[in-house]
Amino acid sequence: MLFRSADGHDISSIASVASFFLSRIDSKVDDMLDQLAEADGGKRDQIVQVKGKVAIANAKIAYQEYKKITQSDRWQTLVAKGAKVQRLLWASTSTKNPAYSDVMYVDELIGPDTVNTLPPNTIEACADHCDVSSRIETEVDQAYAVIDTLPVVGINLDEVMDELLAEGIDKFIKPFDKLMDSLVTKVKQLSPA
């Protein structure tokens, strides 16, 4: 938006989200934590304390960073020119571990300027037992403590995120390529010979 605005273009119609795929984080980190707990019983208590909490902790910290950005002078300059706030989108919100609440990625992350994509089973669970109150800014200190524990037990979250990013891109590239191939085929079929 900075570049568009600097070039004199209207930025008031731009809408966007920054997506966070939540359950993938916990699935990957939890597997690593399980392996570490087996290998190093001395850190078992610390490992158990963070299991199933990394995705939400990371999202809550991201929200704090998001607020800093949207409250900055740089962003406020764009708002004065009509910019809409980019919202945080929570995706992959169905829990993969049956030991966890089926609405944990919803209940804990409700807040201003956020969007949550819900699969049908999570929608049904929310209709039944969600706590619809703004909690994105609760227990932020605990979120930092969860993330700070990871290197202590032997997990580099940056490396985990890089792996998840690569896996996620791959998961989107293959279907996109397949879609493009089918469109090319359809165009050829519909084109006069």
Language-model segments: which ranges?
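Glycine-rich phosphate/ribose-binding loops and adjacent secondary-structure elements
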Residues: 20-25
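Structural preference for beta-strand elements that scaffold enzyme active sites
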Residues: 13-19, 87-89
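Flexible, acidic glycine-rich loops studded with aromatic residues
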Residues: 82-188
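A polyampholytic, Gly/Pro-enriched intrinsically disordered region
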Residues: 5-11, 37-44, 138
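Short, small-residue-biased leader/transition segments that mark boundaries at the very start
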Residues: 1-2
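Active-site loops and adjacent core secondary-structure elements that bind or stabilize anionic groups
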Residues: 28-111, 130-131, 159
